[in-house]
Amino acid sequence: MASSNNDGPIEPEAEPWRITQNDHLEQDLLEEDAESQERVDIPVDDVEKAFSFKKLWAFTGPGFLMSIAYLDPGNIESDLQSGAQAAYKLLWVLLSAHIIGMLLQRMSARLGVVSGKHMAEVAYQFYPRLPRIILWLMIEIAIVCSDMQEVIGTAIAIFLLSKGFVPLYVGVFITILDTFTFLLIDRYGIRKLELIFGFLILTMTVSFGYEFVVVKPPIGEVISGMVVPWCAGCGKGEFMQAISVVGAVIMPHNLYLHSALVKSRRVDRKDRRRVAEANKYFTLESAIALFLSFFINLFVVAVFAHGLYQKTNADVREMCIARHDIPDADIFPNNTEPVEVDIYKGGIYLGCQFGAIAMFIWGIGIFAAGQSSTMTGTYTGQFVMEGFVKIEWPKWKRVLITRAIAITPTLVLTFYSQGVQNLTGMNDFLNCVQMIQLPFALIPIITFTSSRKIMHDFRSSKVFQIFALITSALILSINVYFISDYVFSRLGSEWYIIMVLAPITFAYVLFVLYLALYCLVSCEIIPDTVSIRGFSFNKSYENDAPWLAVDSSAVHDNAGYQ
C-alpha cells in the first residue's frame, strides 16, 4: 500500500521501477566517473567505408578479454575428458557451443554500446529491488565458482611445473599476487591490460598447439568430428559429456563482463552511424577471438582423443611406470576401467608419452589459462558489484574482497583434499553450479536487447529474438537434465533428499519464471498490461537514446529550411 506521506518520494517497494531524483544523481556520478577513465579513441574517418583495419584495431580488445572465459581451466578439463571419452565425435558440439556463445556475446556487446551501460547497471534500473538483489547474489555465486576453478587450475599448474615441490595451498596463496598484478597493470590503462591478455592467449595457443603438432592426430577425423553432427555408438556417458562441453563454454558472468568491456571505447552515441559501426566492429572482433579460442579448445580435444580414447588406466600406468623423470607416474590405478583424466593427470600422461618437455609446456598453458581467467573474473566482480549495489569503494578494496571471497573456500578445499586428483574433481561440481546460474544471465540479456525502451531502434529483430528464446530454452532444458542427473547420482533419490531439495527447486523455478515473464513482455510476445499477482512490469523506465534526439533535430531543421 502506498504511503500518504508527502515529505518524500514513494518507496521503491510501492513502485519498484520508479527512478528517484537520488537515483538520477547516482547515475550521473557513475557516468561522470566512467567518462573520466581512460577510453580508447576511435579513428574519425568516413563512416560509410565498409571496412578499415585501423578501426578494427581500435576496437580490438574487449572480445579477446571476453574469450578468456572460453579458455579457463574448467573448459580445458572438459575438452580433454571429451577427447578421452568420445574421441573426435563431440567436436561439432564444441563448435556449436562457440557459435551460440558468439551470438550471445554479440547481444551483450550491443547492449553496452547502444545503452551506454553494462548489464548490471541496466538490471539495477530495470528490475524491482528484491529481484535485482537475488539476481546480484546469483551472479556473485557464479563468479566465485568460476574464480575457484581458475585458482585451482593455477595451483595445479604450479604443482605440476614444480614436480610437486610447491604444495597446492602455497599455489593458491601465490594466486593472490594476481590481485596486485591486476591493480598494477590497470593503473597503466586498458590497452596495457589487453596487451597482457593477448600475451596469455598467445601462450596458450603456442602451448596447446605444440602438443597438437607433437601428437599429430588424424586431420581427416578431426574435420569429420567438426562437421558431422552425430555421435555414432555413443551412450549416456558421451551425452553427459556433450552437455558438460556446452556448460563449460557458455559462462553466465561473461555476458555481464563483455557489456562492460565495450564501454572502454569512445563511441559517439549522438551519431547513429557511429553506434552501428561500433556494433559491427565489436561483432567482428568477437568472432575472431572466439574463432581462435575454438581452435585452442580443439587442440586439447584432439590431443587426448588421439592418445587416450579407448585406453584403460592400466595401459597408461604401464607406460608411465617405465619413465623415471615424471612425478606421480603411478597416479593411474592398475585396473581395466576406461582411463579417467583431468588437467593434472593430462599433464602426467603427456610427460609419460612424449617426455618431460611436453608436460612442462602443458603446465605453462594451464598456468596461462588460470592467470588470465582469474583476472577477468576479478574484473567481472568489480563491474557486477558496482552495477547492482552501487558500492563506491576504492578499486583496490573491491578487487581484494572479490578475490578473497573466491580464494577462501579454495584454501579450505586444498587443506582438506586428499591429493591433487580430488581437488581437480571439484571442477564437475563447480560447472554444475554455474549451469544453475546460467538463466540469470541468459534471460536478462534477451530481455534487455529485445526491449524498445532500452535499445530503441537497435533492438534485436523478431527473428533473432525467437532464435535466442528457442536456443536458450534448449540450453536450459539440457542443463536441468544434467543438474538433476548430477545431484541424484551423488546424493541419491531417497524421499528425504527430495524433501530437502523440493522447496529450493520450487523457489529457483519461480524466480526463473518471473524473469522469463519480464522477457516475454520485452519481446512483445505478451502485453505489458499483463496483470499477475505480485508482478508489475516496469513501464516508466526508458534508457536515453541521444542519436534519436539528433535525428529529430535534423528532421526539424530540414523541415524549417524547406
From Swiss-Prot:
Intervals, Extracellular compartment:
77-83, 162-164, 216-241, 309-347, 420-428, 484-496
Q: Where in the cell is it found?
A: Apical cell membrane; Cytoplasmic vesicle membrane
Q: List the disulfide bonds.
A: none
Q: How does it sit in the membrane?
A: Multi-pass membrane protein
Give residue ranges on the Cytoplasmic side.
1-55, 105-140, 186-194, 263-287, 369-398, 450-462, 518-562
A single BP term in Gene Ontology: intracellular iron ion homeostasis
Tissue expression summary: Expressed in dopaminergic neurons (at protein level). Expressed predominantly in anterior and posterior intestine, rectal gland cell, H-shaped excretory cell, vulva cells, proximal uterus and spermatheca in adults. Weakly expressed in hyp7 hypodermis, pharyngeal muscles and some anterior sensory, ring and posterior head neurons in adults. Expressed in the anchor cell at the larval stage.
Q: Which InterPro entries match?
A: NRAMP_fam
Q: Any idea what this protein is called? A: NRAMP-like transporter smf-1
Q: Which organism is it from?
A: Caenorhabditis elegans
The gene is smf-1
